[in-house]
């Protein structure tokens, strides 16, 4: 287990002081929370101006393409408003903001700073690191680059491939991490984990390690992803993991007996981690601690997974710290193998005493590289507010998935701890344990 709490050195305990999120529900974590509490769905049928190659994709899928997308124009408008008086911020948006992954990351970061009670000027004075990842570079930039170099497209407009910073600010996967460092003048270690759908949670663990080891006092962590592209959706359809439901809002059904896959979602989640001592010295009361984490590999295959849940069980075993988890935020993709594996792992670890669990992909879509960080933001809110969220579209329990899941919101003020699970293609299996102080 990766432990981030030490009785001998309590000042090095890792606390969460702020968070922000951008999703198909809106440009803030509060909009996301309100939508989840009211059982809304962000997945919608897409119009031709929302996704490339709409006609060909619709023909291939044999239905109208659907996803939970984020409006780049609204994101940029919000960034320009929030950074109108900050010259550094304006230059960062000019250099990086033309790509949706970067712009969502920056907007989520600004919200995270606000909830942490920090201004940009204050944050720029800290000994700060930055661990922000994504599952892939900008697909739009890659596809446009390929189209141009293969002679199929020319005269691409400035702001996409024609932008002078396209190579460094879109084609390289660490662009979103570098954008955060530029905005914050962060000179501590910078990392960009790329671990498929476990990217966000791995970023949190890596940042927590930097703080607990005394390398930095503050670390920006999280991830972003914008994969509502024809190439991704066609590939997932061929893999058999994209939902074929006629009603896209009810397509993704985690742990439901009628589940048949997920819909793609876009988004970003950013958290501010600090050492407990640093947060205390600046007068900030932090009630959420990152107690520990676990990070293992399932070597079964690129997209295959061990259905017994043995690796998931091992991750949960390592997260155990003598106290039962009050709540689990599961990965819950709504695919047959993932949900079976998770359910088996939870049952092997907890036995008949399964804690309440929930998953949000039926509402948000699968955010892929952004899933772990956005879902951790939601898990923190659930723990702070004492709420077990409904698992959207969970109607008929799969008898092969022994789970403690509800389709309606439940109030549980006694929640003091939450465990978050993330799984990713390639065998990434990650867990994180959070505690709330009384």
Residue ranges with predicted function:
Residues 97-102, 123-125, 160-173, 191-199, ...:
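Active-site nucleophile and cofactor-binding loops and adjacent substrate-binding regions
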Residues 45, 152-164, 205, 209, ...:
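Glycine-/small-residue-rich "gating" segment that lines the acyl/pantetheine channel
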Residues 215-260, 293-306, 330-339, 354-403:
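Acyl-CoA/ACP chain-elongation machinery
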Residues 1-94, 277-289, 377-392, 430-438:
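ACP-dependent fatty acid/polyketide chain-elongation machinery
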Residues 105-119, 173-177, 184, 190-224, ...:
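Active-site-proximal alpha-helical scaffold in enzymes
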Residues 9, 13-17, 40-45, 247-327:
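Condensing-enzyme catalytic core mediating Claisen C-C bond formation in acyl metabolism
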Residues 58, 79-87, 110-128, 279-286, ...:
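Phosphate/pyrophosphate-binding loops at sites that engage ATP/ADP/AMP, CoA/4′-phosphopantetheine
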């Amino acid at each position: 287990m990766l432990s981030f709490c030490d009785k001998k050195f309590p000042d090095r305990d890792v606390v969460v002081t702020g968070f922000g999120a951008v999703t198909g529900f809106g440009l803030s974590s509060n909009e996301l929370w309100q939508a989840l509490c009211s059982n809304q769905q962000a997945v919608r049928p897409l119009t031709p101006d929302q996704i490339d190659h709409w006609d060909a994709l619709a023909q291939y899928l044999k239905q109208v393409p659907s996803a939970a997308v984020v409006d780049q124009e609204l994101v940029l408008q919000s960034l320009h408003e929030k950074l109108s008086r900050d010259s550094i911020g304006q230059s960062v948006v000019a250099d990086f903001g033309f790509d949706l992954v970067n712009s969502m990351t920056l907007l989520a970061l600004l919200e995270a700073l606000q909830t942490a009670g920090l201004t940009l000027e204050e944050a720029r004075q800290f000994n700060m690191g930055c661990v922000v990842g994504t599952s892939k570079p900008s697909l739009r930039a890659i596809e446009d680059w390929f189209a141009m170099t293969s002679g199929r497209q020319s005269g691409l407009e400035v702001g996409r491939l024609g932008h002078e910073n396209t190579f460094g600010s879109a084609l390289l996967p660490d662009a979103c991490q570098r954008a955060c460092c530029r905005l914050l003048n962060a000179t501590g270690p910078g990392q960009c984990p790329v671990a498929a759908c476990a990217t966000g949670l791995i970023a949190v663990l890596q940042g927590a390690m930097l703080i607990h080891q005394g390398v930095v006092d503050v670390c920006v962590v999280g991830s972003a992803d914008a994969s509502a592209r024809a190439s991704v959706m066609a590939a997932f359809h061929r893999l058999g993991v994209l939902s074929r439901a006629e009603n896209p809002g009810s397509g993704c059904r985690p742990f439901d007996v009628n589940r048949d896959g997920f819909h793609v979602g876009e988004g970003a989640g950013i958290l501010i981690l600090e050492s407990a001592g640093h947060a205390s010295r600046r007068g900030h009361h932090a009630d959420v601690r990152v107690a520990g984490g676990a990070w293992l590999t399932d070597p079964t295959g690129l997209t295959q997974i061990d259905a017994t849940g043995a690796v998931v069980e091992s991750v949960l075993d390592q997260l155990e710290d003598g106290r039962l988890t009050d709540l689990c935020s599961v990965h819950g993709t709504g695919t047959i193998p993932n949900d079976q594996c998770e359910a088996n792992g939870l049952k092997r670890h907890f036995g008949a005493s399964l804690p309440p669990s929930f998953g949000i992909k039926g509402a948000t879509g699968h955010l892929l590289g952004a899933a772990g960080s956005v879902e951790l933001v939601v898990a923190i809110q659930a723990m702070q507010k004492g709420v077990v969220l409904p698992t959207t579209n969970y109607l008929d329990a799969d008898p092969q998935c022994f789970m403690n899941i509800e389709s309606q919101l439940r109030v549980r003020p006694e929640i003091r701890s939450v465990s978050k699970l993330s799984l990713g293609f390639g065998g990434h299996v990650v867990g994180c344990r959070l505690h709330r102080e009384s």
